[in-house]
Amino acid sequence: QALNDKYPAKETIFYLFYRQRQWNTVERKWMGWERKRGKLEEFNRLLRGASDTSFVTLDGDLSVLQQTRFIITLDEDTQLPRDAAKRLVGTLAHPLNQAILNAEGSRVIEGYGVLQPRVSIAITSACRSLFASIFAGQTGIDPYPTAVSDIYQDLFSEGIYMGKGIYDVDTFMTVLDGTFPENSVLSHDLLEGSHIRAGMVTDIEMVDSFPAHYLAAAARMHRWIRGDWQLIPWLFRMPYNAAGQRVRNPLTLISRWKILDNMRRSLVPPAVFALLVAGMTVLPGGYGRWLGFSLLVLATPIILYVTDDLRTNWGLLATGSLRWLFPHLRIMFHQMLLSIILIPHQAYLMVDAIVRTLWRLSVTHCRLLDWETAADAERRMRVDMRGYFRTMWPALALAVGATGAIVLTAPMTLLYLSPLLLLWLSSPYAAWLVSQKNTIRPVALTEADKQELLKLARSTWAYFADNVTIDDHFLPPDNYQEQTEATTTDSATDNCLAHRTSPTNVGMYLLSALAAYDLKFITLSDFLYRVSKTLETLEGLPRYYGHWYNWYNTQTKELLSPRYISTVDSGNLAGCFIVLKQGIEEFLQLPDSTLALALELPPGSANQAQQLLERREECQQLMNRLMARVMEMDFKLLFDEKRQLFHIGFQVEVAKLDDAYYDLFASEARLASFIAIAKGDVAEKHWFRMGRQLTQSGDMRALLSWSGTMFEYLMPLLVMRNYPGTLLDETYTAVVRRQQQYGVEVGLPWGVSESGFNARDQQFNYQYLAFGTPGLGLKRGLAADRVVAPYATVLALAVDPAGAMRNIATLKSMGAENKYGMYEALDFTSDRVPRGEKFAIVRSVMAHHQGMSILSIDNILQHNIMQERFHSEPM
């Protein structure tokens, strides 16, 4: 009901069903009828008006569901990406994909009754352990340009249904009603897909989880093998139906081959292990030949992968660069090594599953529906070292048996084969070791470092504390510039403040206020007051399609010319509003006593309860207003539907979009793209339309940006999570290392980004430019300037905390520290350095750089709290 209240519609759109367990006389237990297969069959009947199912409806009127045409099936741990459901429905509803049945109505002969999308592994799941990262494969790959080939779909126009997809309800019921006998089918997906004809749609993706440890993966594999071998009856001409009658098998030869091929794959580990042992003991020709052949079987996936990678990356091969291949080869090598170590247990596992199934099929006829969810299996298992040895003892027995056989038949080879035998004997330990949960490394900061960062954050916050006042309508002035002899003229900026502001400035100020509260610089009351006053001013400013303009006068609230809407600025402000809303929501979760203390309400006062109620209501209203402003920003205004890219901005006065685009993934506009997709303003495919050109930086890959600035790479990281093992994660590390390397090359501190530099206009204001690191940006002439921005180093705290602290200390020793944290930049460019000096200090601070610095420090000291807040928003 809460979901229906949150997403109101003309009719109920959220329903909750559960099935009552029934006593199964064959299995001798209370269970849902026919497990998942029965759940789908009964649910289909329920949608068509049946009242004799075991479903219990908890909420909702079922009459509106009787016209349901398609059902999408998901597991609990399956994620359905945005627009995937719409695309699945559109594909299955296409006239050319409509199911056509044979004369008997027992099989779909043209079109499709079910579609199976591509299933990828979630990045977070693949990073849970070394085992998962090795066997989960590549994650986070774009399904649009990388739609994979499926041999069955390519050759026979039908694929394999794996249980996560979309099916036609009427086709399902017509073909499968009464088809399968009870208490016999565990792996129903392949069988159902073979009857109603499954189509593979590999350009549509679902995201699934992967077991974190080996024992859970082994248990899942055991269950799959049992399910596959229980389909033996459907290899023959006359299987039984639900009525217990033998009927003609409608499955095609290729469908039966799919069943047989699954069974064949389960025989590979036992066959390889048997070949290894036989080759080391009794087979002619020497153990080396058979060992090499067995290893070749295990290495076949690596060989196929490498040849395919070489084919698709022939351009890189022609340049002589093979470094891009090494990470993939390393993973494939680890896969082969673990496969060798675990082959005894894998062989035992397969044989055990096969023998159990054959025994139950032919003798006991029970426990054929023995099944446990992967999540329950993971929770039940003992995953300490003792648990691994207790579970994997058959592997040790097989290893000991193989050793004994070698001693008896070929003792002279024992010395040469001992490394392999020792690996087998250590297999429980190896499985336990690679299954250890990956833990987040503690930030490499000492207590002294943390105190130094707190001090830096406090002085940086002082810029906003001093200058965001009623005189500027609680808007942050764009920058502060220290007066020098050159600026003490009548033309100097009044009070050294630039009384103008932008959406990015405002967003960074508001999140800086939240960070200041996190770090105990201000009280909760002060924070709420600041947010309320700034939001009040913002809501009174002119906007365009929900977007704030690029520049306003903070003292008069006048719109500054030229009137312009910036894509990046709108994305930054929207992202800051989302984080701010989640930060305020945290206060509503506090108990009354804690909230009263945070608000400094007098203890025991008679009206404390009323004040608390009012403050909670104030927080709720602030949250609603913030999200309303986000939803009002129409990002379609700035989007090119044909190119699927964002323009740099919109020139309001001439009603013209800029000719240039944000076409690189390594860009500060990544946050705007993410939010626009989350809002539904633009399609998901835009995310994959941005360019991902790579450059080699040392032994790592990095995405190319336009200017090679730290700002482009690391600004989105202030609120967006980083996932280990991804291309972005590798890019962050490579970029910081390259910046550090470049600093060493030119003999300067590192940290290059867009910033002010030591050149002034007629009003003696510092000029501003994007400075980058050669090798990271496409822009030419990046090596011509030598400008170091301290805020760039503070941003790098998220990637290399220890290295950033050392560089901050170096910058401070050079005079970069001031009352508002650190100066804007140090300019080492020779033609801009005063005579007799080694560098010029750009004696200014900029509001958005101040905000980025505070957020970066807050994240490093508060365990990425801003990122967690941003990703907590359901939208």
Feature names for model-found ranges:
Residues 1, 123-124, 205-227, 231, ...:
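Carboxylate/His-rich catalytic cores and anion/metal-binding grooves
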Residues 1-244:
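Internal catalytic domains of large membrane-associated glycosyltransferases
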Residues 2, 25-28, 46-72, 100-101, ...:
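Flexible, glycine/threonine-enriched loop-and-boundary segments that flank and lead into catalytic domains
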Residues 22, 143-151, 181, 205, ...:
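Membrane-proximal soluble regions of multi-pass membrane proteins
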Residues 35, 243-271, 326-346, 361, ...:
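Loop-to-transmembrane boundary segments
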Residues 166-169, 187-197, 211, 247-248, ...:
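Long hydrophobic segments that form regular secondary structure
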Residues 264-365, 393-441:
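Membrane-embedded multi-pass helical conduit in multi-pass membrane proteins
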Residues 385-393, 411, 415-419, 423, ...:
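Ser/Thr/Asn(+Pro)-rich, low-complexity disordered segments
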